[in-house]
Amino acid sequence: MPVVTGRLRDPDINPCLSESDASTRCLDENNYDKERCSTYFLKYKNCRKFWHSIMMQRRRNGVKPCMPTAAERDEILRAMGKMPY
């Protein structure tokens, strides 16, 4: 597996791994009809936007690492009480 692909599959680096997998699975099941999978694409897009804003906020505040680990992300989502995307 190439290094870039390995990084994208790492849950500590990619916060939207489950959304990405769901959209790919939807495409596979629906013969790559993108219109049928638009809700999955939208959820993935919102996930990326949400975690990007968290990452930028942490970077501005000087928190390292900029992207929270998978465990930290679980705590953030639990504290919010619901999925923001």
UniProtKB/Swiss-Prot annotation:
Motif extent (Cx9C motif 1):
16-26
Any one GO biological process: mitochondrial respiratory chain complex assembly
Broad class of the protein's primary localization: mitochondrion
Motif Cx9C motif 2, chain ranges: 37-47
Q: Which Pfam families match?
A: COX6B (PF02297)
Q: Which UniProt keywords apply?
A: Disulfide bond, Mitochondrion
Disulphide bridges in this chain?
A: 16-47, 26-37
* Tagged with keyword Mitochondrion: yes
Q: Does the keyword Disulfide bond apply?
A: yes
Q: Which residues form the CHCH domain?
A: 13-55
Subcellular localization(s) per the UniProt record: Mitochondrion intermembrane space
Gene Ontology CC entries for this record:
mitochondrial intermembrane space
Entry's family note = Belongs to the CHCHD7 family.
Assembly information from the UniProt record: Monomer.
* Designated name of the protein: Coiled-coil-helix-coiled-coil-helix domain-containing protein 7
Report the source organism: Macaca fascicularis (Crab-eating macaque)
Q: Which gene encodes it?
A: CHCHD7
